[in-house]
Amino acid sequence: MTTNGDDEGPTMGDVTSAAEQWSHPAEDVLANWPYPPEGGWTADDLDRLPLDGPNGEPDFFKRVELIDGALVFMSPQKRFHARVQHGLHVRLNEQAPPELRTVSQMDMRLDREWRPCPDLAVIDTEADDDNLTFYPPEVIHLVVEIVSPESEHRDRVVKPPKYAKCGIPNFWRIENNENKPVIYVFELDPATSAYGLTGIHHGRLKVELPFPIDIDLADLPF
């Protein structure tokens, strides 16, 4: 996959070994709730959050991501969002080569203060592990965000530059046009560490990266 510079990025082991310096002790994570722990929230704090809230609220921390050091609670999905996410997940895995795999709603630990949870990502198959709670950017070839009303600013403005800076070579943003998906396809320019728009796809998605893809957007599986 595309990387920036000549130095090799950190390995999975390097990223995992950084966990202790990127997290607080489990008992301290919610000690100051609703304020963050001393030093602010870190990417590995998300692994230490309980499922239920500090006052027993069920599934309070079930859908949360870390964006620039702030906890972001994600709203329930609308049917359009769930349908497109599932359909693309199926189609991408049908067409992917053996060395690549599509995953849905898995965290990406980009650095100490960033752990977003994109709707879909294409990763190296050899990096997949049922015990992981996140993937590092070095194994990610494509990130897909499906825009919802509450996530418009994050998906359009906040997240893409960070994905690009971390060297993720491909980014798709999916918009809802009268309950039909419109896919904006971006490719990384390694010279500037920024994305450039390479196409807007209505009805049919046909691209060559991160692998040859041809999907009828009107015929996504439910």
Where are these predicted regions, by residue range?
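Gly/Pro/Ser/Thr-rich low-complexity, intrinsically disordered segments predominantly at protein N-termini
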Residues: T2-F222
